[in-house]
Amino acid sequence: MKYIISVLIISIASVAYGQEDLPAGNDQFMKRQFEHTATAFKMLSYDRVAWVSSDSIQTLSKEELSTYGGQWFCYLDSAGRYHALYGAYDSTYTLTAHYLVDSASFAVNRTFGQFDTTLAVHYSKAYDLALARKNEFLGPEDRLRYNHFIFRSDTSIKVHFLPAFQPNGYMIYGAELHYTLSSDASEIIDTLEYFNEYRGYQSMPNKTISIVYEDLDYIPVGAVFFLLYYERQFKSIRIVTKDYVTTLIRGKDNEPSWFHVVRTPPKKKKKKKSNP
């Protein structure tokens, strides 16, 4: 289908650096775009902490690793450091290893210092509740690998699940699950579960690809994360939603901006009446 093109370019540098100002006159689409971009940037840092700290945990002794029950998460403290915690949860949190990760350089150092034990319990409970709901939604036959991201605010804990990079080299999109829990993780208070179908690509640096969400009138968090996380694997990535085609452009100093093309179907031409 051909479309009349209307272009809107929005800088996302302010989002990347944690500012929350929205462009004047923005509509609901743009508002959600800025919110989801901010979340995706936090996910990128969370994922980086996972990578650098997981390398360190491989160096632990067999005795130490025997206490690891699969509960891993990280949180950012008031000093701007990430705490990556690996352990097990069974009504209480048992720590296997605790790493401090610099939020700028992502340098990793193991620490035997204190950590937020209450938060560790709440994060573990939140993860277990959200994981159970995710598995119920996707069903027992689903075997796709997912990454999880856990964030907190003063009033809630949010657990996000996005498809991970798969062992067969495919980068997958088409499903994402987001759960908001009470601050003590005693219950799920809001749910956003999206599944269309799993679709994906392998790395093609010279090809422009499209990730398609034509059933949505907004750009989901998973689409933003996919573009930011895998942008070097392709020439360009386009996000196609109901009303927009969106991509990322970079200006001076590699500053990113969203490039939105409004999808407006052209008016059909009236057929000329033939003379009798």
List the model feature ranges, each with a label.
Residues 85-135:
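Hydrophobic alpha-helical segments and helix pairs
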Residues 186-221:
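Short HxH-centered metal-ligating active-site micro-motif
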Residues 217-276:
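Hydrophilic extracytoplasmic domains
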Residues 1-25:
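Bacterial Sec-dependent N-terminal signal peptides
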Residues 164-200:
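Short helix-loop boundary/capping segments
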Residues 19-82:
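Start-of-domain marker
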Residues 59-98, 134-175:
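Exposed beta-strand-loop-beta-strand "reactive/processing" segments of non-cytosolic proteins
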